[in-house]
Amino acid sequence: LIAVVYRYDPPGRKKEFRPWDAKRRKMAPPEPRPLFNQPGLVAAETVVLTEGEKCAQALIGVGVVATTAMHGANAPVDKTDWTPLQGKAVLVWPDRDKPGWEYAMSAAQALLTVGAASCDVLLPPDDKPDGWDAADAISEGFDIQGFIASGPRMCIKPLNTVRSQEATVWATDDALA
């Protein structure tokens, strides 16, 4: 046991999360923050990264290998241990909202930095409501396997792979190509 995240959904209030660090034996997130479902990640070639434990658990419940960072879209990407996803094909399934998209983009770069084999961000359908997520998809009978296999997606490349044109521009004596 690395950590536990207690989720509370008090009536009429925002959901609350309270992490427990098993090693330090206190109510605080561990450093670095572990990914959810680590035993399930070990043998997987492809993993779906969601925005929270509820969505990851819903996907696991229908046979999809899934994980999430502690605190979902509010996760400090730089404090998360992404190394269990090295060498894996990762599909990021964001919630259909601005925080979900921003989290997907920053998590994708972190994944590529630690050596994920590939990283694609699934594009939620345009006709779904704001905030729609993997758990909603499952509850409404959405074709999860079809969406994961061939749904619209954006292939993410590392930011540092932009080729500089400096060598080609300055390779001549007068700097005019």
What are these regions (language model features)?
Residues 2, 11-12, 23-26, 43-47, ...:
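TOPRIM fold recognition
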Residues 3-5, 30:
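Short capping micro-motif at the N-terminus of alpha-helices
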Residues 7-21:
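Short, surface-exposed, low-complexity cationic segments
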Residues 18-19, 47-49, 177:
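Short, conserved beta-strand segments within well-ordered enzyme catalytic domains
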Residues 19-33:
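Short N-terminal or domain-adjacent regulatory/targeting segments
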Residues 32-43:
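A short acidic-Thr-Gly-centered motif at the start of a beta-strand
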Residues 155-177:
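The Walker A/P-loop phosphate-binding site
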